[in-house]
Curated annotation (Swiss-Prot):
PANTHER family: 30S RIBOSOMAL PROTEIN S14 (PTHR19836), SMALL RIBOSOMAL SUBUNIT PROTEIN US14M (PTHR19836:SF19)
Superkingdom to which the source organism belongs: Bacteria
SUPFAM superfamilies the record matches: Glucocorticoid receptor-like (DNA-binding domain) (SSF57716)
Subunit and interaction comment: Part of the 30S ribosomal subunit. Contacts proteins S3 and S10.
Record function comment: Binds 16S rRNA, required for the assembly of 30S particles and may also be responsible for determining the conformation of the 16S rRNA at the A site.
One of the Pfam families matching this protein, by short name: Ribosomal_S14
Molecular function GO terms recorded: rRNA binding; structural constituent of ribosome
The protein, known as: Small ribosomal subunit protein uS14
This protein's UniProt keywords: Ribonucleoprotein, Ribosomal protein, RNA-binding, rRNA-binding
GO cellular component terms, semicolon-separated: cytoplasm; small ribosomal subunit
Amino acid sequence: MAKQSMKAREVVRVKLAEKYRAKREELKAIISGVNSSDEDRWDAVLKLQTLPRDSSPSRQRKRCRQTGRPHGYVGKFGLSRIKLREAAMRGEVPGLKKASW
């Protein structure tokens, strides 16, 4: 199990990313815009740097819903590989069966 503080940190990151999403997209559009002047781009870069670090979506980590484990995450199910295997062995995942060849 992941520490509760790590799970809470991820929740904060998701909330911050949602809060600053529109502002971040607006600034990035100015930076990558063809019609923007160099001065406007520079101002947008400086404003983007003043936003909280955790408001960037790339700082978020996908975690297992049951344990909070960050590695071995299977996105289709939202579980880590370990919990997915346990659920599959109990028959709780419809259509999923152990590979055999």
